[in-house]
Amino acid sequence: MKTKDHFFKAVCTLAIPVALQSMLQSSFSMVDQIMIGQLGEINVAGVGLAGKFASIYSVVISAIGAVAGIMIAQYLGQKNRSEVRRSFFTNLLLGAGIAGMFMVICTLFPNQIMGAYTRDVQTRQAAAEYLMLISGTFVPMAGATLLSTLFRCLEKPRLPLYASILSALLNTGLNYIMIFGKLGISPMGVRGAAFATVISQCANFLLMLLMLSKNGFLLKSNEGEPTATLRMNWGQYWSMLLPLLVCEVVWSLGENVYAAIYGHMSTDASAAMTLTNPIQGLVIGALCGLSQAASVIIGKHLGSGENEKAYWSAKKLLLYGAIGSVFLSIIVIFTSKAYVGIYQVDNVVKAMTVQILFAYAVVVPFKVLNMILGGGIIRSGGRTKYVMFIDMVGTWCFGVPLGLLSAFVWKLSIPYVYFLLSLEECIRFGISLIVFHRRKWMNQLEAV
């Protein structure tokens, strides 16, 4: 009983702050979406499409953060402080370099990028302007992602939560002032939303840097300990990072193909999908803490050689995810109409959004369990090739073909298109369960 109580407490300590942080960000994103929604369908669709391309960068940085988390958690389990420091700084430098590359691309070629998403000239212009401006968030986002990973592995997930609360409040306030023109500032519309996002992301990063100065004791070498260098087991490192980068980028490209499908169906379809994003973020955010808890708890068990304990912990986390996801699906079904009624958009868009949310509620349990399996459990051993295989098969062998067929061959409406392409989650879940039960994902990382 004490073991179970200790495990549940450990899960709550890690999962609740992460879930609150994600839900908070999604809640404020919903408020931002409502503000942008007052600007009409073109701006709603434009911001949504720009966000889809920016998500490619987000998943690349997330992959780097995930590798950092795998390494830090396992080396903490091994009680190897020098490897913890090396893991953090190596991934931080790589993340900063990739952030700079994406920023240059989005600044120089925003119109060309957005032209791949929509043929509507006005929507493309709005999306290109927004994309160019929010590229200023890429560098601080990289730093904040790595710092959040470090704090969570140190079992201090409240620190990034506090920073997110303050930055989200700042973002919402600035959005209101800049979008609608308050406190003597002229209305800036979508440009105002972008500026608010950049400022709040920079503030978030600076706040976490301040927290690091008081809580980053592991990054400081004690007397007699080796200082952090970039000398490491690069073969092992790239064997973790490259599959994650491939699967995350390929998955994100698949999501962008989905966005392009919606955009080429109609502006109304694209706007309806955009309106569902805050709800999707809230639902996944409410349970994403279980995935983060899995990566830290199971990673430490694997690092210390406790494989049976890791497997038992994984099964308990999957049970928590199954119960929570079914509960949230029911809430989505009963609140969808009230949520859509908030927006000042055409009734056709509202009806589409409600139907899409119903379809989303059906696949939520599979999405959540896949998040815990692929995003936390299976990758915690560092053998990320399994995750790459699962994501590539699900997205490109099932999701994308079903999306293209249902939209352009079968000519189905957007709710049916979304539901059919989301069936890839069921395929992904089946493969993940097979990999999980075979236990070949269990692995202890080597130190230099």
Label every PLM stretch briefly.
Residues M1-V18, I72-V139, I185-L242, I298-V363, ...:
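Short alpha-helical transmembrane segments in multi-pass integral membrane proteins
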Residues K2-I34, Q38-L39, S55-V67, M71, ...:
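N-terminal transmembrane alpha-helices
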Residues T13-D32, L133, S167, S200-N204, ...:
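Transmembrane helical elements of multi-pass membrane transporters/channels
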Residues L20, L24, F28, Y57-I61, ...:
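Residue-level hotspots within pore-lining transmembrane alpha-helices
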Residues M23, S27-A45, M114-V121, I177-M188, ...:
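Helix-terminus/linker motif at the lipid-water interface of multi-pass membrane proteins
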Residues M30-I34, V104, L146-L150, G173-F180, ...:
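Alpha-helical transmembrane segments of multipass membrane proteins
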Residues V44-V104, L108, M141-E155, L159-P160, ...:
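Small-residue-rich hydrophobic transmembrane alpha-helices
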Residues G65, I134-C153, P160-N171, A193-M208, ...:
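Short runs within selected transmembrane alpha-helices of multi-pass transporters and secretion channels
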